[in-house]
Structures are given as structure tokens and as C-alpha cells.
């Protein structure tokens, strides 16, 4: 175990695990698996996409072989438009060919899409095999890889098909961000800003104090690890309190209700998930101002920080009636009423279940 690694415990009653953050942790994946109880002869299916595998696939496979595991590597296409049943079939076919058993393991090596699909494939193969998440994008490191949400998209909406399936381990190696495209890095910053707004004022203010948070090359390694660690810890603490999203875990959807509408109406691929969430946060911030829940100055601070991160802050050109219709397809709608997580102050939010179409129209007219 590398003493320089940071360990965050996700202390769930039935499925506890750790988030391990540290440089060069990819090389030690075999040792980390041994530390949590896996033994030689373990059948492992590593799922990745070509771009990520070209950089890190050999390193992972060598570490697994060194620990006397039996790995197979599956390369599939990534991208939101690939997050479908056809991709799950590819993973299941590979699991069959690798003769995976219930005690076997799938490893998701990639961004949020690879993590979501591999997690869902693991949840549904043999009614559940082990999964380990090795996120290689900033967004996946601080959000998608933690908490056990897995799934794929449906033609009617994002993530409508899925399951809760907690990983056995989340392994985060910040050096993988070096090969991450600039736009993807900025998209990940949206989720980090989200954590600042929903639960961590100190993180929000830390980001405000930085001269540049939109370019990885201008962020010192110590700061990068700190913001990843704080964000991952925020996510873990919420998941511990509410594993299956029956209460406070809904706070993690801040900005996502409007964000999913943007992705759905604009078509998956037009905007990255983090970009859509950024615009969604600005929109719901305006909704909160309308309701008198938080001060306009806080909404402006949020928008400035989003723009500082190089993220879009202006609402896209969408028909308001189309937005209202799309909102009705949200998973969190109850009795026809749309729920929104809204800020009370920076570092504190609350879920509201009684938002009328009139209020939403007024908000969208204001920001359009």
C-alpha cells in the first residue's frame, strides 16, 4: 500500500469500499486488489475505450498479471451515444467468453460512460459480479465512479435504465488527466463547482481564489489532488447517508434536472455532461433567486466561477414548451410536479417538489 495515497472510506452497511487517490496508483492495481481480498487465479475483464487503453491498458494488464490474476481486455466505443443496450451486449459477450463467474471481476478503465456501462454490465451479469472503477476523466473521478449508480440511456431519456451496484474499489490516479482533452477537463470542473455549492463553501472559495481553473497545466499537483479529494469526500459522505437516493442523495442532482433536458433536447454529443450541468446550475440559480431562496449576489458568484472554469453559462436556444415537456420525463417527477434542488446559500441546498410550470417559464424567459 502506497503511504502517499489518500484513502476515503465509503462506509456503507452492506458494501463498504475505499476510494484511493494517488500518483502512480495504476501500477499498483494488482496489489490494491490483493489488499481487499482478491486472490491469484481471479478472472478479470477490463473494459476500456481505445484512446484510454492505448495510454494505460498495458500498465493495468501487467500489474494484474504480476499479481497472478487472469485478465482479458475489451475495447469498446465510448461517448454518450454509445451508452446503450448494444454496448452492454458486447460486454456480456466478452464476460461469457472470459468465463467470468460470480466471484470474478470487471474493471472499468475510462470516463463516466465506460464506468456507467461496465457497472451496469457487472450488475446484470450472473445477477451481479464484482466491479472496480478506475476513472480517467475529472468528472468520473469526482462523481460518476463513486456511489454505485450504473446505467444506460433510453431513446426517451438519459439514464432511464440502470441499477445500483457499488464498486469494490475506486482507484484514482490524477496523472491520467494529462491525456484528457481540455474540454473534458473543464466539464469535470462543473461537478467540482457543484460540490462547492451544495456542501462545501471552503472548496467554492478555494476555487474562487485561483487565477486559473480552466487549464490543467496551470493547476499545481497539490491543488489538483486537494480538489479531487474534497469532491470525492463530499460525494462519499452523501452516499453513506443515502445509498439509494431516497433523501439527501438527491442533492447531487443540483443542476442536473435542467442539464438532462439540455442533453436530451440538443441531442447527446452536442454538449458534454459537465457543460450541460453548468448551464443547469445557472438556470436553477435563477429559479432560486426568483423564489427569494438565495441572494442574487450568490447567483452571480456561481456564474462567475462557472465562466472562470471555461464553461458555458448561457441557456441554449430551446423552445420553452419543449423544455417543460422534457422535464416531465425526469426520473424525479412525482404526481406531475418537477423537483429541483435549489441553493439556500453557497454550501447549502434543499430539495423542492412543488415547482410550477409558471415559475419555470418565468425563469427560462429571464435567462434566454
Curated annotation (Swiss-Prot):
Q: GO:BP terms for this protein?
A: amino acid biosynthetic process; aromatic amino acid family biosynthetic process; chorismate biosynthetic process
Enzyme Commission number: 4.2.3.4
Cofactor: binding details: Binds 1 divalent metal cation per subunit. Can use either Co(2+) or Zn(2+).
Report any Pfam family annotated for this entry: DHQS_C
A Gene Ontology molecular function term for this protein is: nucleotide binding
What does this protein do, in the record's words?
Catalyzes the conversion of 3-deoxy-D-arabino-heptulosonate 7-phosphate (DAHP) to dehydroquinate (DHQ).
Instruction: Answer yes or no on keyword Flavoprotein.
Output: no
Q: What is the lineage of its organism?
A: Bacteria, Bacillati, Cyanobacteriota, Cyanophyceae, Synechococcales
Q: In which pathway does it act?
A: Metabolic intermediate biosynthesis; chorismate biosynthesis; chorismate from D-erythrose 4-phosphate and phosphoenolpyruvate: step 2/7
Q: What class of enzyme is it?
A: lyase
Keyword terms, alphabetized: Amino-acid biosynthesis, Aromatic amino acid biosynthesis, Cobalt, Cytoplasm, Lyase, Metal-binding, NAD, Nucleotide-binding, Zinc
Q: What is this protein called?
A: 3-dehydroquinate synthase
